[in-house]
């Protein structure tokens, strides 16, 4: 076997292989012997068919199969010998074949980039230092009450915490625009659903009033034709409702799994959940900065085959989220996912190199802790832990999570990490 390797472009490679004629003939004869043992031909007992008849009847197909097998096996031998690491499926390009002559073919493929991590010491990470205060718990309790609120119609003017039912028609330069009109639109004030100035224009008005407000669409608004444009909205205010918050009664508290129904018990449960969320938020904030720094410090080429594969994964995930099927998933434009796919591949390659250079393996104690932390959010944590322990795929996924955490910690060990005092609300809003 003769082998030559050339770089086509970037990570592209072409391996050209020549297989000697005698190697092909030996393999063909060997396979014909195997065929002769199995075939049934009228007039001959099984395994007793003369080789010339077997060759006459099956020679062409056997030779084709043998060539395909030799191409595959010799390519594998070649990349092992040349220490090449292909990324994605290879493309075989057979040359002209003539019986009794050497056979030359080529294989085109991409290789994984050679990653040499640099700049880890220059990565800057700001670790949030946060504690859950009594005031944070008060805010969360208020949020829980608002989620269970009832609404009661009122006669007074709408204010920042009310809910209104309106008809509205929007126009720019006197012309109505698509999506700018609605009837019986229910708007809970104070949630930032509308463009700046809209809710302020509604506040102070009563049911039965019709009025016009002037607003300006933000420069970053999603509709290109409305970015930065001044608009008028004619509004008919049909109904104003005020929020009624439930009291922290024993019955209300027990809805959240607090068996004794006490306010102290609810506060303790809320604090525990907030601290669990906080732990995850701090971890994610630090991780995202470490990975961002790693990516910026290491500019690497990425095999197109890996990006294509990741795009297919993202397509399928998107289709599943919106109830689509496999066919619909593959029809989604690749442009929607290309940037995210490339980013994921780059991060995977860089973290993979961190894992390799640090000889990391998933810490089973960490895996156990991650499962327990995740399970604590469920009503029966023991049942969840047992379910994970009996599911190999779930356990492998959690080991990957643990290994990724360990890789991030290896990056942080060399990075410049500082601490910054932050409030619970500020950190959680950053995560949103």
Swiss-Prot record:
The keyword Magnesium does not apply. Keywords: Cell cycle, Cell division, Chaperone, Cytoplasm, Isomerase, Rotamase. Its EC number is 5.2.1.8. It catalyses: [protein]-peptidylproline (omega=180) = [protein]-peptidylproline (omega=0). GO terms for biological process: 'de novo' cotranslational protein folding; cell division; chaperone-mediated protein folding; protein transport; protein unfolding. It is found in: Cytoplasm. Involved in protein export. Acts as a chaperone by maintaining the newly synthesized protein in an open conformation. Functions as a peptidyl-prolyl cis-trans isomerase. Consists of 3 domains; the N-terminus binds the ribosome, the middle domain has PPIase activity, while the C-terminus has intrinsic chaperone activity on its own. NCBIfam families: tig. HAMAP family: Trigger_factor_Tig. This is Trigger factor. It comes from Salmonella paratyphi C (strain RKS4594).
């Amino acid at each position: 076997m003769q082998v030559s390797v050339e770089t086509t472009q970037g990570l592209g490679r072409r391996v050209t292989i020549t297989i000697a004629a005698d190697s092909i003939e030996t393999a063909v004869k060997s396979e014909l012997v195997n065929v002769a043992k199995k075939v049934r031909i009228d007039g001959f007992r099984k395994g007793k068919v003369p080789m010339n008849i077997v060759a006459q009847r099956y020679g062409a197909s056997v030779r084709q199969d043998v060539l395909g097998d030799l191409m595959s096996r010799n390519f594998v031998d070649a990349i092992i010998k040349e220490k090449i690491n292909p990324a994605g499926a290879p493309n075989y390009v057979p040359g002209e074949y003539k019986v009794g002559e050497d056979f030359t073919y080529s294989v085109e493929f991409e290789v994984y980039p050679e990653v040499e991590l640099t700049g880890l010491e220059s990565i800057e990470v700001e670790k949030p230092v946060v504690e859950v205060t009594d005031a944070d718990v008060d805010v969360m309790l208020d949020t829980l009450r608002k989620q269970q609120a009832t609404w009661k119609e009122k006669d007074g003017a709408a204010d920042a915490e009310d809910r209104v039912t309106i008809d509205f028609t929007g126009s720019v330069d006197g012309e109505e625009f698509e999506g700018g009109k609605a009837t019986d639109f229910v708007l809970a004030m104070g949630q930032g659903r509308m463009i700046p100035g809209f809710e302020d224009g509604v506040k102070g008005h009563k049911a039965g009033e019709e009025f016009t407000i002037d607003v300006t669409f933000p420069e970053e608004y999603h509709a290109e034709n409305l970015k930065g444009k001044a608009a008028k909205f004619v509004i008919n205010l049909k109904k104003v409702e005020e929020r009624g918050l439930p009291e922290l009664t024993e019955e209300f508290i027990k809805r959240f799994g607090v068996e004794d129904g006490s306010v102290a018990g609810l506060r303790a449960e809320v604090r525990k959940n907030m601290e669990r969320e906080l732990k995850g938020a701090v971890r994610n904030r630090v991780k995202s900065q470490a990975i961002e720094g790693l990516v910026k410090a290491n500019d690497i080429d990425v095999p197109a085959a890996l990006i294509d594969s990741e795009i297919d994964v993202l397509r399928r995930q998107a289709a599943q989220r919106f109830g689509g099927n496999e066919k619909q998933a593959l029809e989604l434009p690749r442009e929607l996912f290309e940037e995210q796919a490339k980013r994921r591949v780059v991060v995977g390659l860089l973290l993979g190199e961190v894992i390799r250079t640090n000889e990391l393996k998933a810490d089973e104690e960490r895996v156990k802790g991650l499962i327990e932390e995740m399970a604590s959010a469920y009503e029966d944590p023991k049942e969840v832990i047992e379910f994970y322990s009996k599911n190999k795929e779930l356990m492998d996924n959690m080991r990957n999570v643990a290994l990724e955490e360990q890789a991030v910690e290896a990056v942080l060990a060399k990075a410049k990490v500082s601490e910054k005092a932050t409030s619970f609300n500020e950190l959680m809003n950053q995560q949103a």
